[in-house]
Amino acid sequence: MGFGDFDFLCNKSPLPLCMLVGPYDKPTTDQTPLLNGIGLMSECYPRSIELANTIIFQVGNTFIHIGALPVILIMMYTVKGKYTAIGRKELFHFLSCFLFLTCMSLVVDAGVAPPGSAAYPYLVAIQNGAISGTMWSLVNFGFLGFQFYEDGTRRAMLFLRGTTLCAFLLTFIISLFTFIPSWGSDAIGPHNTVGLFVVLYLFNLIFVVVYILSQFALAIFILQDIWMIGAVALGTFFFVASQILLYPISSIICKQVKHYIDGTFFATVTNLFAVMMVYKFWDMSTKEDLEFSVGQKDNMWETKELLGEDNGMSRYEVNGSEYAGSTFALNQHQF
C-alpha cells in the first residue's frame, strides 16, 4: 500500500468511496472488483433489509443519522437564543454544515442511490465536500476565542461562508475526477487517489488537530477553567474513539455481531458526541448578558424574592391602604 491508497481503510471499513476507487494493482483471478473493474472490498458488511420494496443499507447507521437530526436542530435553536454570545453565528454555521453532512451521509449510507447508479459518484462527492467544509468551519470557529478578528460581522461571515464553499468545491471536484474514469487522467483517477486522500484525510486531520490544540490553549492559558479543559478532553476522546471504531476494529465488530452492525454504527454515535462537546465548550465559555434572557434561562441579575419586612422598608397601612401615606400635609405651615 502506497501513500494515498485506500487499501487499508477500505479493507477494514465499508466506506462509500470504496466502491469508486482502486484496485491499485492489476487484479488477479481471485480478486473481484465491484463495479466495472473498479472498487475495493471490505472484510465485512452489515446486513441490509427490505422495507416496502426498498433495500436499506447500513440499517443501524441509518437510524443513528435520523436520531442525530433533532439533536443537531436543538443545539442550533439554543445557539440562536443567545443573541449576544461570542461566536454565535460561527457556531451556527458549523452546526449547519454538520447538519448538511448528516443528511448526505443518511442518503448515501441508506442506499437512496445504490452503488453502480449514475448518481452515486456525485452523492459521494457531495458527502466528501461536506466533510471538508465542516472541518474548515470547525477550525475557523476555534480561533474566535483569541479575538484575532471581530466575530459575527458581515465581513467575517462572508469570509467564512466563502472559504467554506471553496473547501467544499475543492474536495467535490477532486472527488469527481477521481471517481469518474472518463474525467480523470494518469495523475488522478480511480487508480491514483493521492489527491483525494490529501484533501479528504490529510487536510481535515490537520484542521481537527489545530482546533483541539487551540481549544486546549484557550481553556488552560486564557480561561483557566478545569471544566472547559474537561469538555475539550472529552470531545477529543470521542473523536479518537470514532476513528478507532471506524477503521481498525470495524470489521471485528461486524463479525462478532453476525453482520448486524459494524464500527460505523458506533463511530457515528461518538462523532455526534464530539460535536456536542464542541457546543458544550462554547456554552460554558459564554454567558447571556441581556437584561431579559431570550433563551428563557434565569437571568443572573433577576431578583428572586420580594423585599421582606426585615430589610428596614416594611409596609404599613395608612387609612386602610398598605401604601405609605403622603407627607405633603406635614410640610405645610400655618401663617
Swiss-Prot record:
Q: Which GO CC annotations does the UniProt entry carry?
A: endoplasmic reticulum membrane
Can you name one GO molecular function term for this protein?
unfolded protein binding
Which GO BP annotation is one of this protein's? Answer: cell wall organization
In terms of domain of life, where is this protein from? Eukaryota
Q: Where are the transmembrane segments?
A: 55-75, 92-112, 129-149, 164-184, 193-213, 220-240, 259-279
Under the subunit heading, UniProt states: Interacts with CHS3.
The species is Yarrowia lipolytica (strain CLIB 122 / E 150) (Yeast)
Q: Which InterPro entries match?
A: Chs7
Highest lineage ranks of the organism?
Eukaryota, Fungi, Dikarya, Ascomycota, Saccharomycotina
What this protein is called in its record is: Chitin synthase export chaperone
Topological category with respect to the lipid bilayer: Multi-pass membrane protein
Q: What does this protein do?
A: Chaperone required for the export of the chitin synthase CHS3 from the endoplasmic reticulum.
What are the alphabetically sorted keywords of the record? Answer: Cell wall biogenesis/degradation, Endoplasmic reticulum, Membrane, Protein transport, Transmembrane, Transmembrane helix, Transport
Q: According to its UniProt record, where is this protein located?
A: Endoplasmic reticulum membrane
